Every structure is written in structure tokens, then in C-alpha cells.
């Protein structure tokens, strides 16, 4: 079975200032299930990263996706 990530938890795992950052990082890092990011979620996360964070965060996320982390 796979863990399908939604925008909120995925974004929270990338934004250290988010109140749920630590919990979302733990969930993503410690699950044994394959992680899946639906295309619409990736589009939303891209928007939030560009509005609230730094484009380098998106580059790191895309690198992780290319490496098979998601």
C-alpha cells in the first residue's frame, strides 16, 4: 500500500517555520510505505514554495523525486 501525500503535510515537511514541520518530517521519513505525490499536489506545493519559501526548496524536492524518494 502507498502513502498518498496531500499538499498540507508535504508543504509542512518543507517549511521549518510551519507548526507541523517536525511531525510531518517524521511521518515522511519514517514510513515504510512508498510515498506518492499526485500531480495536482505537486502544482500546489510549487505555488506555496514560490510564494512563501525559496525556489531552492523546490529544486531539492524535485531532486528527491528524481532520486525515487517519492
Residues covered by each model-derived region:
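Short, well-structured N-terminal submotif of metal-dependent ribonuclease cores
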Residues: 1-37, 50-63
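Histidine-centered beta-alpha loop that forms part of the nucleotide-sugar donor binding/catalytic region
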Residues: 40
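Amphipathic alpha-helical segments within well-ordered protein domains
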Residues: 43-46
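Short, intrinsically disordered, charge-balanced linker/junction segments flanking boundaries
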Residues: 62-70
Amino acid at each position: 500500500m502507498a502513502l498518498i501525500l496531500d499538499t498540507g503535510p508535504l508543504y509542512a515537511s518543507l517549511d521549518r517555520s510551519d507548526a507541523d514541520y517536525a511531525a510531518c518530517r517524521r511521518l515522511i521519513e519514517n514510513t515504510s510505505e512508498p510515498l506518492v505525490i499526485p500531480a495536482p499536489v505537486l502544482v500546489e506545493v510549487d505555488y506555496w514554495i514560490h510564494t512563501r519559501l525559496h525556489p531552492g526548496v523546490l529544486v531539492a524536492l524535485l531532486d528527491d523525486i528524481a532520486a525515487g524518494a517519492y
